[in-house]
Amino acid sequence: MALHFSKEEFKSRKSNILNSMKEQNIDALLMFRQESMYWLTGYDTFGYVFFQTLVLDQKGNLILLTRAPDLRQAQNTSNINDIRIWVDKDGSNPTDDLKIILDELNLKGKKIGIEYEAYGLTGRNAIKLNQSLENYCSIEDKSELITKLRVVKSDEEITYVRKAANLADLALEEVWKYAKSGASEAKILAEMNLSLIHI
């Protein structure tokens, strides 16, 4: 598992989310934003344009619902232990699979926060989700819950930001050697990347 932060860092993030959920009287949070999933678990995928959600309930249960093509990515980049697959085929409705998870977590009649502002939650999927949860639970838009928590950086995050800034400075120094009239952007980008590989 290629996690970029310590177990303690991820534990602290989860605790902060749970505290925020408790303050807002949210029994569970459905994360659809890739950046939220990454921040909480390390899960990194290009599959964020498809329906996938990370469910976190007040008890700390964490379940990812995703497509089969993203299974290995979830296993190899995150600390998520419970990964469920929905079958991506004509006529399938992943919100049916999600509802099974919500039933397992005893969330019927509870209050669920949803990250509606997300690339993977298209208008059509949001409509399906709302229809699926109608008369099942109460829902609220909680698109900013994790975003607000991410604003305050931890010591580990500040260390990464400083390292990233130093790397950006090194790459910029390299750019000036090649940036001139008529220069190929591909060549400039290649030299920038090459300079970072040799560090």
Describe the residue ranges of each PLM region.
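Non-catalytic accessory segments adjacent to catalytic cores
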Residues: S92-T147
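Terminal domain-start leader segments
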Residues: M1-N61, E173
